[in-house]
Amino acid sequence: MAPPSHCHTINGGAPRNGAIPEVETTTSTPAASDTALLLDADEFRRLGHQVVDFIADYYAGLGDYPVHPSVTPGFLRRQLPADAPSRPEPEAFAAALRDVRDLILPGVTHWQSPRHFAHFPASSSTVGALGEALAAGINVVPFTWAASPAATELEMVVVDWLGRALHLPESLLFAGGGGGTILGTSCEAVLCALVAARDRKLAEIGARRIGDLVVYCSDQTHFAFRKAARIAGIPREHCREIPTCRDDVFALSPTALHAAMQADVDAGLVPLFLCATVGTTQTTAVDPVRELCAVAARHGGVWVHVDAAYAGSALVCPEFRDVIAGAEAVDSLSMNAHKWLLANNDCCAVWVAAPSALVAALGTEQEYILRDAAAEGHDVVDYKDWGTTLTRRFRALKVWLVLRCYGVEGLRSHVRSHVAMAAAFEAMVRGDARFEVVAPRRFALVCFRLRSPPERLGVGVGVGGEKAANELNRRLLEEVNAASSGPYMSSAMVGGVYMLRCAIGSTLTEERHVREAWKVVQERATSILRKRG
């Protein structure tokens, strides 16, 4: 990927983004053997200022970078030494920052770019980033209450704060007998919930019947669930992917779920776990939580987990809370605050109605984990028993800072601004007869495609015509993403229909970026159709 056109060169012609300043080189980084300086306050302050300036200038000039790099595999490995230096390099930190600028930044996909529309957001904020820095600087390992009492209790406070901000059922909060924790991703969350459900069920029916357990999802459920099922020992053939259809806006049908569960019961199998999704990755479809919970309850108390990784953030807005109607009956729910709530990667909050099931499945009692006398006689939370890892990060600190500094109203405004921009983009699509919106927009994702010429004439395309229409849209996406300083979008194939995805959610995205993106789409469509005659 070529650097922005306004770049100038340094170091004998190496390209450099003019927005990012030269790095100070007046003091060398202390040698690792000089332990007195490894965490020297003055050195930390000096280098820290350089990093803050570097990041600030990166954000200031981010709009000048192509969103996605045009590089080939091995491009970076060829430019870096095969071995780490045996001794500190001269001016090592400054040299490393220059390499970040000149070698690494040109080869990353700029997820914070205002023109990044390909994926659900990995939202950043000043407070979120500085909260990460603060947690890294304090660097505690809060696996038990005794290991870091304040970190544990802040996490308990934060998950209840966040749960109330999202209007979750009281039964999922510590205040209501449930509880929550902050993990890295929804992949971890669904795995932990599945293991808890598995062990609870096997305690009831016997461990020998693990081969009879069956789990359920839709064909739109994130692949992380299938991976979690394999890790948990569920055979591939016992993971039921229930087909969805366009008539149901790609949501999981309660009727189809009941039929699948009943067929398994009739075959002597044991329904175990349902993963419902609120805001699927491909189209943001919303599974009907209340109705699915009712089906699960009819089949021996199947554990219901709601994956709201993306759309869960929208629950801060009252107008979206209907999407989890019936959630008081779920066993667990997870959402990624790093996707849309300004908390920076990584930050997945998960709540469970019965924490005891989680602790029973994941708890440990090793002697080397020291207990604090102050905790004796108290019902403390040891978060090592709520996840798969012992070492864990102090993620609650940044979430606490985000909630304090932006407030729930600030988060609502943030989400609503993106929803409004998505609505504007949707209106632009509908205003051009050459295009169609393929799936209903619920949040800030617009799924659309270019109609083939027969479709625009009202003629059915048939199987062969559908294939041609899909190829037409594949070409359109390639052309859109190839545009210099243009938008970066992605695709989905749902119900045999290939569509473009425009996911609006970058903290830096403004209305002008959305209008410019649509202009590029229109121009590329015009060019493609003209060439086709």
Swiss-Prot record:
Enzyme class: lyase
Alphabetical UniProt keywords: Decarboxylase, Lyase, Pyridoxal phosphate
Residues noted as binding pyridoxal 5'-phosphate in the record, renumbered to the chain: 281, 336
Domain of life assignment: Eukaryota
Gene Ontology CC annotations of this record: cytoplasm
Catalytic activity: L-tyrosine + H(+) = tyramine + CO2
Annotated positions of the N6-(pyridoxal phosphate)lysine modification: 339
GO biological process: amino acid metabolic process; carboxylic acid metabolic process; tyramine biosynthetic process
Family per similarity comment: Belongs to the group II decarboxylase family.
PANTHER family: GROUP II PYRIDOXAL-5-PHOSPHATE DECARBOXYLASE, TYROSINE DECARBOXYLASE
Function (record text): Catalyzes the decarboxylation of L-tyrosine to tyramine, which can be converted to the hydroxycinnamic acid amides feruloyltyramine and 4-coumaroyltyramine. Possesses low tryptophan decarboxylase activity.
Name of the featured protein: Tyrosine decarboxylase
Organism of this sequence: Oryza sativa subsp. japonica (Rice)
Lineage: Eukaryota, Viridiplantae, Streptophyta, Embryophyta, Tracheophyta
